[in-house]
A protein has these predicted regions:
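Intrinsically disordered, low-complexity acidic/polar segments
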Residues: 47, 74-76, 133-137
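Acidic-leaning, charged glycine-interspersed low-complexity segments
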Residues: 88-132
Length: 137
């Protein structure tokens, strides 16, 4: 099973933002040039193998990545699109909890406007497809 923590660690390893500016589950301080990784609040259908859980080869974890960057719409869009392209190409990422096979990006990065202080924000929605370990592996 891949957790939000593993996804956060991978996003941090990309070097888009400083490690201390990559948050998981909450973005309390809202510093400029930060990324937030959240469990998606959207509902998606559940997928199960016909033969039961022992035959499942992969799992899905739905996440939302918030790009909270600076007051420049252009700079913020560039960061969001760059991160999107990096995730689109990512394959077979080893984490402490298992292997992320790939990111299934659900749509292009979305501009969600500015926060209370005028910082531009974009979101990326993705399904993290990960390899499930079978019993005894």
């Amino acid at each position: 099973m891949i957790t939000l923590g593993s996804v956060r660690e991978y996003i941090s390893s990309l070097g888009v933002a400083e490690d201390e500016h990559v948050y998981m589950g909450t973005l309390d301080v809202k510093q400029e040039k930060s990324l937030g990784v959240y469990n998606s609040k959207h509902q998606y259908s559940s997928h199960r193998a016909l033969g039961g859980p022992d035959l499942e080869g992969y799992g899905e974890k739905y996440v939302t990545i918030l790009v909270h960057w600076d007051k420049s719409p252009r700079d913020t869009e560039m960061v969001a699109v760059g991160l999107y392209e990096t995730l689109r190409r990512a394959r077979d990422i080893l984490t402490e909890e298992g292997t992320i096979k790939f990111f299934q990006l659900l749509y292009d990065p979305q501009d969600i406007g500015k926060d209370d202080t005028g910082i531009c924000e974009w979101v990326i929605e993705a399904a993290v497809i990960f390899e499930k370990k079978r019993e005894g592996e």
